[in-house]
């Protein structure tokens, strides 16, 4: 299986951040499968970070890609956020938004949606500025390494977040389990692990470019998380899938887990 799995080098050479953003995060067609999934993710992130008490000083977002939607509610609950990705072009795309460069992707429809969820305490521009102020570092990461962020010195995090990343980064189940343990090395004991990802997806498309995904069901994910030294506090599955031209997933899952004080 691994021989046919999209390599890291392919992400560096063929992953186009702008195409990805245009395909999956344009809120223009609110009724598309992609928009429905994005709204679901935003609602769950709001629930986790604004209603359920997942908060603290430091949140590390693993595999941010070129996106910021996953941090719009988190910036209300964490003083500092570190964004990370494997591909340089995704980090560059994030920097464009952080620096308000004119060619940065327009997240304002998504930001407005989150502000509505949060009761319109602030307007979109203020929310964007709050997130920009919260993001303290933009770092390279590789979840398959025992030190996912290399030698960068960071205090143990209160929360590690990963959305739509691990399935694409791990070619097999043992690698997936190791990646979860590697993420645990970034967390303080009792710290939160928040993951959202597709279920049973073997690929996703960006235009004509196909990228591999590790097709895991709920039971495999739950077992891997527990084996990696966490206790699961919340696990939700929805049946909504991406458009058939975009991916072959069978729903998505969201989970909140906590790192055990003593490793298994």
Swiss-Prot record:
Mind telling me which SUPFAM superfamilies this protein's record contains? S-adenosyl-L-methionine-dependent methyltransferases (SSF53335)
Q: Which UniProt keywords apply?
A: Acetylation, Citrullination, Cytoplasm, Methyltransferase, S-adenosyl-L-methionine, Transferase
- Positions binding nicotinamide in this chain are 197, 213
Q: List the InterPro entries hit by this protein, alphabetically.
A: NNMT/PNMT/TEMT_CS, NNMT_TEMT_trans, SAM-dep_methyltransferase, SAM-dependent_MTases_sf
**Stored NCBIfam families:** GntF_guanitoxin (NF041360)
Q: Which EC number(s) are documented for this chain?
A: 2.1.1.1
Q: Which residues carry this modification: Citrulline?
A: 18, 132, 181
Q: In which tissues is it expressed?
A: Predominantly expressed in the liver. A lower expression is seen in the kidney, lung, skeletal muscle, placenta and heart. Not detected in the brain or pancreas.
Transport recorded as keyword: no
Additional info? Answer: Prominently expressed in the stroma of high-grade serous carcinomas. In tumorigenesis, regulates the epigenetic reprograming of cancer cells associated with increased cell migration and metastasis.
Q: What modifications does the entry list under PTM / processing? A: Deiminated by PADI1 and PADI2.
Listed PANTHER family: NICOTINAMIDE N-METHYLTRANSFERASE, NNMT/PNMT/TEMT FAMILY MEMBER
This protein's GO cellular component annotations are: cytosol
Q: How is its activity regulated?
A: Inactivated by deimination on Arg-132.
Q: Name one GO molecular function term.
A: pyridine N-methyltransferase activity
Reactions this protein catalyses:
nicotinamide + S-adenosyl-L-methionine = 1-methylnicotinamide + S-adenosyl-L-homocysteine
Name of the protein described by the UniProt record: Nicotinamide N-methyltransferase
What Pfam families would the database entry show? NNMT_PNMT_TEMT
Which residues take part in binding S-adenosyl-L-methionine?
20, 25, 63, 69, 85, 90, 142-143, 163
Tell me, which GO biological process terms does this entry list?
Answer: methylation; nicotinamide metabolic process; positive regulation of gluconeogenesis; positive regulation of protein deacetylation
Q: What is the effect of changing residue 197 to A?
A: Loss of N-methyltransferase activity
Summarizing the function annotation, the protein's role is: Catalyzes the N-methylation of nicotinamide using the universal methyl donor S-adenosyl-L-methionine to form N1-methylnicotinamide and S-adenosyl-L-homocysteine, a predominant nicotinamide/vitamin B3 clearance pathway. Plays a central role in regulating cellular methylation potential, by consuming S-adenosyl-L-methionine and limiting its availability for other methyltransferases. Actively mediates genome-wide epigenetic and transcriptional changes through hypomethylation of repressive chromatin marks, such as H3K27me3.
Oligomeric state and interaction partners are given as: Monomer.
* N6-acetyllysine: modified positions: 39
Q: According to its UniProt record, where is this protein mainly located?
A: cytoplasm
- Report the outcome of residue 18 to K: Has no effect on N-methyltransferase activity
